[in-house]
Curated annotation (Swiss-Prot):
Keywords: DNA-binding, Isomerase, Magnesium, Metal-binding, Topoisomerase
Name of this protein: DNA topoisomerase 3
GO cellular component: cytoplasmic replication fork
Annotated spans, Disordered: 691-711
Sequence positions that bind Mg(2+): E8, D104
HAMAP family referenced in this protein's UniProt entry, alphabetically: Topoisom_3_prok
One annotated GO molecular function: magnesium ion binding
Its job: Releases the supercoiling and torsional tension of DNA, which is introduced during the DNA replication and transcription, by transiently cleaving and rejoining one strand of the DNA duplex. Introduces a single-strand break via transesterification at a target site in duplex DNA. The scissile phosphodiester is attacked by the catalytic tyrosine of the enzyme, resulting in the formation of a DNA-(5'-phosphotyrosyl)-enzyme intermediate and the expulsion of a 3'-OH DNA strand. The free DNA strand then undergoes passage around the unbroken strand, thus removing DNA supercoils.
Domain annotation Toprim: ranges: 2-135
Start and end residues of each Topo IA-type catalytic domain: 152-580
Catalytic-site annotation from UniProt: Y305
């Protein structure tokens, strides 16, 4: 009898097979005399669509809403059905005694496995592999500590409740809005409050009125002393009068105070912090950061589990620190890391806190030494940031003397504040940091002359537009960006981690860009006309971050066994009925801001011009029609003059390729250019065909020369 291990992806299945020496490769799985390892391809099973309950629901009609099934159905995803059949056969195989779930250790990973097991009708015992890295050592250690699968039932119930609630609310709200206003509109419990966050910030900026104010400082021996009150004066004349009173008046140093202070390194990275920093430093978006991080985790195995919301480590990891530091010696931080090899680490250090780690600890390097030449430029940047933050967290604090010099002149007090570094501590990790010295020339009681008075004009600045990094942070802490009626609501938002989860926020932002609800101009995220109308047409409660936070709070309670999933789903059904009725009874109107005069060739309605990732297309305004045609799209064809990518306008014989430099050419000319470019060249396929044809011939010098090529 064997144990069947179910991984989430083929790459993880290979890692497990390698760690446990499961060497026999089969079609869709690995096997030895103790284990069988197979895999999902992400989700193999998903919620059924409305038309899979009732074929009449394929057409979107307002009168059919709300769609609330008595029992939720699941279906096998068509494009991965072959692998599902393999997994199903293995689960039901008589030689399999139990199932070991080895999908991602979290809510969604649990759902991936359990939906498959439920669809198959599994009755066999379940055990759970729960690890935060896929190194050989972590896998082997994890298999020594397998958990009873029943310990994770509540996690599964929470995942299932989240999935079903999103289906019930999302399907009905989107269909209701779309059919009511004859437009492609989408609502969701996470995406709609996110649009509201962006809109609120945009309104604050639009309504902001700058105010002018003035400050006063004095220059003494080359040092600037600021007026102690730090008051902003809106009346410049007040300061000018003060300056007149200071003319030809000497000052006196009232005190020189030195206070020794310490500053501590930032917390270790969780996913949101890392995504925010990658955007701030390199303008790399959250989705790209997560994909790169996933590659470092799965392919290279040099970082721990990416989708974590924790900034801390567990105390049982103390003994692994030296090994992790050792691998960082392969990076540009080797000189800074070397002293840490002789340091003793304690579980009392602030980075170790079991209470602040739920599913997964902070993102840190694994014990696998990276092959730096194998990493892409983006992977190198990301890995360096993780190493930098990790090493900083293990270093002693930065120490400095905070010096405050107080100056009195004509009854007014001015201060000079300077910091002098005494111990670099964690700041030694970053390049360019060094010990500083201040040769301040002041002593208590000194009489000093004022060499210059400075009245400076300032203007208050509006809040900044969100960018992809700061929007992530706002989703995590929406209570800092919106007005709430009650302080307890702010606490709810803080405790539940805000809108969405670390694993879903990047996808939500990406989706909002794709549906043209928000847009980014010069890195500034703004709500589009469509996004504003979605907020106006959506039920008010669905635009509030508080509602989704309250739902997330209940999901967490389900996860902890303190709330019934069935109760939560019933609440979502009642909420959905109210939402649909509200939309049905609304007298509001929707106005397409991108409607063209081009008629749809299928149904005759006017088409809408929409932006896509690679250009523009025309889409029928009727969602049930689904007719689309390209207006323009970027191609991989290059301009013969400047070598930039050409944009294609139109199609067929009428198509024209244009470049930003002004070059243009017809489809016929492009075809001719490509033909002449490729003429005389022999393809790899043709060379292989020639080799095979002449396999039995001797004394063929051309064939012998081709043998040395990697074909």
């Amino acid at each position: 009898m064997k144990s069947l291990i179910l991984a989430e992806k083929p790459s993880v299945a290979r890692d497990i097979a390698d760690a446990l020496q499961i060497n026999q490769k089969r079609n869709g799985y690995f096997e030895n005399n103790q284990y069988i390892v197979t895999w999902a391809l992400g989700h193999l099973v998903t919620n059924a669509t409305p038309e899979q309950y009732d074929k009449n629901l394929k057409e979107w009609r307002l009168e059919d809403l709300p769609i609330i099934p008595k029992y939720m159905k699941t279906v096998v995803i068509g494009k991965t059905s072959k692998q599902f059949k393999t997994v199903k056969a293995l689960i039901l195989d008589n030689k399999v005694k139990d199932i070991i779930i080895a999908t991602d250790a979290g809510r969604e990973g649990e759902l991936v496995a359990r939906l498959i097991l439920d669809k198959v009708g599994n009755k066999k015992p379940i055990r759970r592999l729960w690890i935060s890295s896929v190194t050989k050592k972590a896998i082997q250690q994890g298999f020594k500590n397998l958990k009873d699968g029943r310990q994770y039932n509540d996690l599964y119930y929470a995942a299932l409740a989240r999935s079903e609630a999103d289906w019930i609310v999302g399907i009905n709200a989107t269909r209701a809005l779309t059919t009511k206003y004859d437009a492609q509109l989408s609502l969701g419990r996470v995406q709609t409050p996110t649009i509201q966050l962006v809109n609120t910030r945009q309104q604050e900026i639009n309504q902001f009125k700058p105010q002018q104010y003035f400050t006063l400082s004095l220059t003494v021996k080359g040092f600037d002393f600021q007026l102690e009150s730090n008051q902003r004066y809106t009346n410049k004349e007040t300061l000018e009068q003060m300056v007149n009173n200071l003319k030809n008046v000497d000052g006196k140093i009232k005190s020189v105070a030195t206070k020794h202070k310490k500053s501590y390194p930032q917390s270790l990275y969780n996913l949101t912090d890392l995504q925010q920093d990658m955007y701030r430093r390199y303008k790399i978006g959250p989705k790209e950061t997560l994909n790169t991080l996933q590659s470092l985790y799965e392919r290279h195995k040099v970082v721990t589990y990416p989708r974590t919301d924790s900034n801390y480590l567990t105390t049982d990891m103390v003994d692994t620190m030296k090994e992790r530091i050792q691998v960082t010696m392969a990076t540009t931080y080797k000189d800074q890391a070397r002293p840490l090899m002789s340091k003793t680490f304690s579980s009392k250090m602030s980075i170790f806190n079991n209470q602040k780690v739920s599913d997964h600890h902070a993102i840190i390097p694994t014990e696998v030494r990276p092959v730096m030449s194998d990493l892409s430029n983006r992977e190198l940047k990301l890995y360096d940031m993780i190493v930098e933050r990790f090493l900083e967290a293990l270093m002693p604090p930065h120490e400095y003397d905070a010096i405050t010099v107080t100056l009195e002149v004509a009854g007014h007090t001015f201060v000079l504040k300077e910091n002098v570094t005494t111990v670099l501590g964690f700041k030694s990790i970053r390049q360019g940091e060094s010990i500083t010295e201040m040769q301040q020339p002041f002593s208590e009681g000194d009489e000093v002359k004022i060499s210059k008075t400075n009245i400076r004009e300032h203007e208050t600045t509006p809040p900044e537009y969100f960018n992809e990094g700061s929007l992530l942070k706002a989703m995590e802490n929406p209570q800092n960006f919106i007005q709430l009626k009650d302080k307890k609501y702010a606490q709810t938002l803080k405790q539940t981690g805000g809108i969405g989860t670390v694993a879903t926020r990047a996808d939500i932002i990406d989706k909002l860009f794709n549906m043209n609800a928000i847009e980014s101009r010069d890195g500034k995220i703004k709500v589009t006309s469509k996004g504003k109308q979605i907020l106006e047409l959506a039920p008010e409660e669905l635009t509030s971050p508080l509602l989704t936070a309250q739902w997330e709070e209940k999901l967490l309670l389900i996860e902890r066994g303190k709330y019934q999933a069935k109760t939560f789903i019933n609440e979502m059904k009642d909420f959905t009925k109210d939402v649909v009725n509200g939309i049905k009874n609304s007298d509001r109107k929707y106005k397409h801001d991108n409607l063209t005069t081009t008629e749809c060739p299928t149904c005759g309605k006017f088409m809408i011009k929409v932006k896509t990732k690679n250009g523009q297309m025309l889409v029928c305004q009727d969602p049930s029609c689904k007719t689309k045609k390209n207006v323009q799209r970027k191609t991989n064809a290059r301009c013969p003059n400047c070598k930039k990518k050409l944009t294609l306008f139109g199609k067929g014989k009428e198509a024209v390729y244009r470049c930003v430099c002004g070059h243009s050419e017809t489809q016929a000319h492009m075809d001719q250019r490509m033909k002449s470019k490729s003429s005389g060249k022999v393809s790899r396929k043709e060379m292989k065909k020639y080799m095979n044809k002449n396999e039995g011939l001797d004394n063929n010098p051309f064939k012998d020369a081709l043998k040395n090529l990697n074909l």
